[in-house]
């Protein structure tokens, strides 16, 4: 009898853990950013910072770019990643989009955008090092407000990165999200590459 009760308790615990895991993945990836979401309404008052040198930042008086300027009336592919100069981001994620840029243009995409929780000056140097600035528009989310608004923020203090973002991608048409993908973990690169989003356009 005691053994039967123990087995039932263990089974209940396993089911609870499995349900929690499913809920965690769902809420993390899709609670605020889902198909049909107006990305500008989901992040009201939020602006991004276009990648540039420090001198360009000074001359522009550290101006920012409203989300409406980025998305309204345009077909945009946007992907977010944990940080400039990090492994998967540098070796796989950005190169994936850079190498497929002609395919995006052939599908009528107006811009391919990379956004990261970094200042725009660090991102600028990184983009130049990757030789990707001519193909991809890079933006900083220096205070993380954009990702927090979309429910895509992620604490990566364990990797000495602090508050960052999930690894994700989306196809956005006139501000409305048409497709969105979020990795199970920021270190994964399974569903957010260029080939996946190309198949969703």
Curated annotation (Swiss-Prot):
A Pfam family per the record: Redoxin
Active-site feature positions: 89 (cysteine sulfenic acid (-soh) intermediate)
Presequence range in chain numbering: 1-30
Residues bearing PTM Phosphoserine: 149
Tissue: Expressed in the whole plant.
GO CC terms of this entry: cytosol; mitochondrial matrix; mitochondrion
Keyword rRNA processing tagged: no
Gene Ontology biological-process annotations: cellular response to oxidative stress; response to oxidative stress
Residue numbers carrying Phosphothreonine: 37
EC number from the UniProt entry: 1.11.1.25
Compartment(s) of residence: Mitochondrion matrix
Keyword S-adenosyl-L-methionine: no
Induction: By oxidative stress.
Enzyme category, top tier: oxidoreductase
Major localisation: mitochondrion
Reaction equation(s) it catalyzes: [glutaredoxin]-dithiol + a hydroperoxide = [glutaredoxin]-disulfide + an alcohol + H2O
Keywords associated with the record: Antioxidant, Mitochondrion, Oxidoreductase, Peroxidase, Phosphoprotein, Redox-active center, Stress response, Transit peptide
Function, as annotated: Thiol-specific peroxidase that catalyzes the reduction of hydrogen peroxide and organic hydroperoxides to water and alcohols, respectively. Plays a role in cell protection against oxidative stress by detoxifying peroxides. Reduces preferentially hydrogen peroxide rather than alkyl peroxides. May be involved in mitochondrial redox homeostasis.
Assembly mode: Monomer.
Other information: The active site is a conserved redox-active cysteine residue, the peroxidatic cysteine (C(P)), which makes the nucleophilic attack on the peroxide substrate. The peroxide oxidizes the C(P)-SH to cysteine sulfenic acid (C(P)-SOH), which then reacts with another cysteine residue, the resolving cysteine (C(R)), to form a disulfide bridge. The disulfide is subsequently reduced by an appropriate electron donor to complete the catalytic cycle. In this 1-Cys peroxiredoxin, no C(R) is present and C(P) instead forms a disulfide with a cysteine from another protein or with a small thiol molecule.
UniProt family annotation: Belongs to the peroxiredoxin family. Prx5 subfamily.
PANTHER family documented for this protein: PEROXIREDOXIN, PEROXIREDOXIN-2F, MITOCHONDRIAL
Name listed for the protein in its UniProt record: Peroxiredoxin-2F, mitochondrial
């Amino acid at each position: 009898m005691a053994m039967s009760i123990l087995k039932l308790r263990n089974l209940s615990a396993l089911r609870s853990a499995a349900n929690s895991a499913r809920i965690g993945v769902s809420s993390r990836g899709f609670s605020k950013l889902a198909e049909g979401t107006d990305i500008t309404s989901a992040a009201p008052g939020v602006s991004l910072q276009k990648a540039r040198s420090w001198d360009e930042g000074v001359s522009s008086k550290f101006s920012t770019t409203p989300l409406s300027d980025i998305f309204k009336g345009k077909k945009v592919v946007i992907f977010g990643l944990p940080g400039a100069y990090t492994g998967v981001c540098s070796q796989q994620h950005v190169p994936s989009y850079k190498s497929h840029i002609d395919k995006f243009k052939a599908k009528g995409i107006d811009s391919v955008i990379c956004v990261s929780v970094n200042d725009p000056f660090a991102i600028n140097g990184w983009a130049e090092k990757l030789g990707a600035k001519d193909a991809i528009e890079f933006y900083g989310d220096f205070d993380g407000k954009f990702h927090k608004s979309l429910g895509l923020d992620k604490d990566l203090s364990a990797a000495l990165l602090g508050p960052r973002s999930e690894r994700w991608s989306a196809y956005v048409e006139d501000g409305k999200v048409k497709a969105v993908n979020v990795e199970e973990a920021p270190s994964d690169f399974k569903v957010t590459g260029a080939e996946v989003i190309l198949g969703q356009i």
